[in-house]
């Protein structure tokens, strides 16, 4: 069983400011190739992991790899059950949950696509998810999508640039 707090802290400790997500993308690709039964694609610094069970429906679960620029707050710090550090909330905590889920899912009831993409924190013209929709739409096609952005536990409809 993966400890989500430890995994999130590990992700926080990997610098991944916008346009500099390669090291984090490499970690996601390596973990997914080594620990899942999913088909893995790499497009630049986007990592896509897909089940290929030919189920009737597909859910897309996506999260961005980048953070805002560091300001002396890069390193992870755990205090009890709370994690502090650059990107802990937006969105490396969500990424940890998504990665752990991708590693745990064997035979989902619906097909699933996990999309880990760069450049969400900057201008929409650089957004890695938008680039995937333009260049590789078959990799991000689905019936419904969930993004793990922090929303104070509220359901929100929308995404930058879409």
Regions found by a protein language model. Name each.
Residues 1-88:
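Acidic/His- and Gly-rich active-site-bordering loop/insert found
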């Amino acid at each position: 069983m993966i400890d989500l707090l430890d995994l999130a802290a590990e992700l926080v400790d990997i610098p991944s400011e916008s346009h500099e997500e390669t090291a984090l993308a490499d970690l996601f690709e390596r973990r997914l190739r080594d620990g899942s039964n999913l088909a893995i694609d790499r497009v630049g610094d986007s990592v896509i992991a897909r089940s290929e069970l030919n189920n009737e429906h597909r859910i897309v679960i996506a999260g961005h790899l980048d953070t805002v620029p560091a300001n002396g707050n890069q390193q992870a710090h755990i205090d009890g059950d709370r994690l502090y550090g650059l990107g802990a909330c937006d969105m490396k905590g969500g990424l940890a949950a998504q990665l752990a889920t991708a590693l745990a899912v064997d035979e989902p009831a619906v097909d699933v696509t996990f999309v880990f993409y760069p450049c969400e924190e900057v201008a929409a013209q650089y957004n890695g998810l938008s680039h995937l929709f333009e260049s590789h739409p078959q990799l991000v096609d689905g019936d419904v999508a969930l993004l793990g952005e922090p929303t104070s536990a509220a359901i929100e409809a929308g995404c930058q640039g879409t």
